[in-house]
Regions:
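Beta-lactam-recognizing serine transpeptidase/beta-lactamase-like catalytic domain environment
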Residues: 1-24, 29-225
């Protein structure tokens, strides 16, 4: 496996073949499933003292930061590990897995070049530790950068994923176009309302959250760090 062969790893296209623990960007998937399982998600409230406590272990926020009282927008913007591990602990793992697979985890990706499938590792046998770790982007779940870019693009496109392509057009020596790639809809990953709500959360990240360095940009920024 070239992915695990350090001597040849320079040959790997890390954008599509890299298998990485996602980190806090996975909170997008956790948030989407929480929204689907809890129609009153806008009433979410959590008090963060810097640590969430579970039986036999605890999960801390970055640098032990205590975020105080948070709604779901605040928890997402602050990337609050305490809030999201608590959210994850309350999710139905079967539904959580389905949401991840709706977003093409454990599925083929619409790519015409070599890639590695992203893996959502939770199932009915998973422990509380595994579930809470996964909900904050740690644990055994892995994803490629290209796959997360597809999810972000679908959120921007009202839930619809377009088929990625590399070559836009082919021109001859006279600069005449001899072949033009046509845009193709691949799949609807989420509803337009879900995408709209996730954009609101991602806007908060770049307005006052962990990505607030973008707050004064001369364009509207959405993100998750």
């Amino acid at each position: 496996d070239i992915i695990n062969d350090s001597s040849d790893s320079r040959l790997v296209n890390r954008a599509t073949q890299g298998k990485y623990i996602p980190g806090s960007i996975f909170k997008i998937i956790t948030t989407l499933d929480y929204m689907r399982e809890n129609k009153n998600y806008n009433k979410f409230n959590y008090y963060c003292d810097g640590k969430a406590r579970f039986k036999g272990f605890s999960i801390k926020c970055f640098d032990g930061t205590a975020h105080g009282s948070e709604d779901l927008t605040d928890a997402f913007a602050h990337s609050c590990n305490s809030a999201f591990s608590t959210i994850g602990d309350k999710l139905n793992v079967t539904k959580y897995r389905k949401t991840a697979e709706d977003l093409l985890f454990n599925k083929d990706l619409p790519l015409d070049i070599d890639y590695n499938q992203s893996v959502f590792a939770l199932d009915s046998t998973s422990t509380q530790f595994d579930i809470t770790q996964t909900s904050i982007g740690q644990g055994k779940t892995t994803v490629s950068p290209a796959h997360m870019a597809m999810i972000a693009s679908a959120i921007a496109n009202d839930g619809v994923l377009m088929k990625p392509y590399i070559i836009d057009r082919v021109e001859n020596s006279s600069s005449n176009i001899v072949k033009q790639t046509k845009e193709q809809k691949y799949k609807t990953l989420m509803t337009s309302d879900e995408a709209k709500q996730l954009r609101k959360y991602m806007s908060a990240v770049c307005t006052y959250g962990t990505g607030k360095i973008m707050a004064n940009a001369n364009y509207k920024a959405y993100g998750k760090t």
